[in-house]
Amino acid sequence: MKKTTDKIRQDFLKFFKEKGHMIIPSSSLVPYNDSTLLFTNAGMNQFKEIFLGEKKSNYPRVATVQRCLRTGGKHNDLENVGYTSKHHTFFEMLGNFSFGDYFKKQAIEYAWELLTSKKWFNIPQNKLWISVYKDDTETYKIWNDIIKIPSERIIRIGDKNKEKYNSENFWQMGDTGPCGPCTEIFYDYSDTMKIDPIEFLENKNGRFVEIWNIVFIEFNRISKTKIISLKNKSIDTGMGLERISAVLQNVYSNYHIDVFQKLIKNIAQLSSINNLDHISFQVIADHIRSCSYIIADNILPSNEHRGYILRRIIRRALRHGHKIGIKKNFFHKLVSSVIHVMGKTGDILKEKQEKIENVLKIEEMQFSYTLEKGLKILNSEIEKIDNNILSGKTAFYLYDTFGFPIDLTSDVCREKNIKIDYNSYELAKEKQKEQSNINKKFYKNYNNNIILNDTCIFEGYTKTITRSLVKYIFVNNQSVSKIIKDEKGVIFLDKTPFYSESGGQIGDIGQLYHKKSSFLVEKTKKYGKTIGHIGKLISGQITLNDSLFSHIDEDYRYAIQLNHSATHLLHATLRKILGDSIVQKGSLVTNTYLRFDFSYVKSIDTSQIQKIENIINTNIRNNIKIKTEELNLEEAKKKKAMALFDDQYGSIVRVVFINNFSIELCGGTHTQRTGDIGLFKIISQSSVASGIKRIEAVTGQKAIDYLHEKDNYIKDISLLLNCSTVDIKEKTKKLTIKTKNLEKKIIQLQKKENTQYIKKILKNVTEIKGTKLLTNIFYDYEQKSLRMIVDQLKKELKNTIIILINIINNRFTIIVGVTRNLLDYITAIKIMEMIINKTNGKGGGKKEIAEGGGANTKQLPSILNTIKLWINDKLNEK
């Protein structure tokens, strides 16, 4: 019986546990404290600090199954996914590591035992080939003398371009630092067992597949050509789970292993295509795995950084779904299949299934329309090509207008043997950046043009007034030594209680003053790592190095704090009522109200709004103490602190606790207890984009003012209705019924009146080659009635063109109707175009009916004659 992928994963860990290794869980796909990587792309990433000597390991030997993603930089497999049998965006890396414990001999023996012993993987020894670095004689001898691999199956790999240590079999972390030779184990898929080192090196037909790489970290690279021995030597190994599964399940393509076949069969059920080897099935199966795990690690689709990688993968999958005829939203429905096939690795997905599905569904809904439209334009442009090269300008237009990542466009072109002019694509991209910079000039004049490599100590968490020193003054973006009365500028201090606009919270206002000088702070913003106080000097003058008082407007700050703490309560409550799959998409905290945007596909009803308000106000009445702590980022994550973890945080973060109800990373200012908020009231709930909801709310006195205002509205309405406030609902219901009945009577009267008009205007019918043309001019007639007349005439007549004109105050409106049997050669929209072109009017519509209007009424008689001639010509063509 073949081993399942889940069993292979468990056997690997069991083997190394028996060999004294500590089993370490996979780290996140988002590398911790490593700005050099977008995503974790190897098992060793989480041990990088240990290999660099910056940190000591708690265990001398460990083993992991690491979730990895390769979609950018040196390791970018995205464009190959689906087209080859071995490439994936997401994969699992099996790895064992030694930190100054065992070295070459033991590492090789462990690998050989696991791969070849009957107890474990039981791969025939003669199916395995070995590569070693040309100068690593020690490793060669271990394979040859101890493991007994014939010398013909041990291939020495040299340096590229005669450059020392530049070899496939010499690993290095960077230009300098830990490095060392590696040995790779290959599986031979051939049945011939022919020993041919040349064929091995060329590997044109994919006969040999690398399954395990063992790196011997024994040197420290000082320069390009100089390396020295490390005191503590380490082992770093990596074996792709998908590749070893293909070997042990006796299939060549990774997409034929159990995990992918189950996924592909589920995808095929949504499509009319029966070929399970179809490239699109492979792409979608790969991409749903990567997207699920990326979102599980708190990355959301966006237009930059990790979020854009996620968006690119999603959109590539959606395009392949479209290609195989899946028109409805489908991608999010595959998440449950991924959880099912991934075994224990799928547990992290199970916890966040609803969130993953919602994020994918929203992204799919937002992109589906532009995908259809963009593909039509791309295919149209491809048809025009005569040199097999798509203009980079077109590729950029698709990216800029329809959100087509360049690799999506490249994917379509690849299928049609079309190349993209990447040079002109980059030029178009650069040009747009330049234009964008011009558009931002005003903003830059007030922010980015002031560049300071300095810091400012923020004391606003505990103080509202501070004695500060003036370090810099800017007026009109120029650094000056002083600012005088009535001048506007930006003042920078050594320390301040002013909170700078950040994290959705607006900046403080207040005053900087000393003696008879006073600077009114109207806005506070960040400039790099320092804080700028923007405003106007209202008296005296302020000079560099002056000592002054910086004093925030305490009422203004207090109102902001109420709204910020309420925002945290709202966020936690939304997750409680609507599900923890909701994701914050933006927020604004001001002194007058708060705004919170979040992803949610369904509508939110009144009862849910009331539940949200009730829970928040209960927490307010409970007068909970709000605490803040500075924690290590990993500690914060363990406490399940809510955060946008795709953001760049430092190693130490500030966490705001409202008991266990709300735990959130936040640098903003908050009230001391929830009771200070007083009252929370939602004033509006709306959709701001597909799948994005917005709630606006008020707190404290503003909430009371809002309720008073509503109360006054109700009293005013009761006066108008001449009833008590408790009877408003019943009185309104009766008035509504009465109004509807009156509207029905009006429509009946209009129909009678229209019938009389129709009898009159039918006398104006003229015939052109058997087709009726009915024209009539009305004066001060209701537009709605005209539409009813046109609809009625179209139902009663055949072979008829109707043109009704209504003149009001020297302006005209016009309705054109054409019966269906004439639409092949005469349309209402074409007639309307002729009218508005002659009168400089405006209009639009469809083939059967069109509406428009204008001011040039004098031209109407001659235009009607022109239309008659045009109709005559069209009927002649018929």
From Swiss-Prot:
Q: State the source organism's domain of life.
A: Bacteria
Kindly list the positions annotated as binding Zn(2+): H564, H568, C666, H670
Which lineage ranks, top first, belong to the organism behind this chain? Answer: Bacteria, Pseudomonadati, Pseudomonadota, Gammaproteobacteria, Enterobacterales
Name used for this protein in its record: Alanine--tRNA ligase
Q: Which InterPro entries match?
A: aa-tRNA-synth_II/BPL/LPL (IPR045864), Ala-tRNA-lgiase_IIc (IPR002318), Ala-tRNA-ligase_IIc_anticod-bd (IPR018162), Ala-tRNA-synth_IIc_core (IPR018165), Ala-tRNA-synth_IIc_N (IPR018164), Ala-tRNA_ligase (IPR050058), Ala_tRNA_ligase_euk/bac (IPR023033), DHHA1_dom (IPR003156)
User: In which compartments does the protein localize?
Assistant: Cytoplasm
Tell me which family the UniProt entry assigns to this protein.
Belongs to the class-II aminoacyl-tRNA synthetase family.
User: Cross-referenced Pfam families, in alphabetical order?
Assistant: DHHA1 (PF02272), tRNA-synt_2c (PF01411), tRNA_SAD (PF07973)
What GO cellular component is one of the record's annotations? Answer: cytosol
| Needed cofactors | Zn(2+)
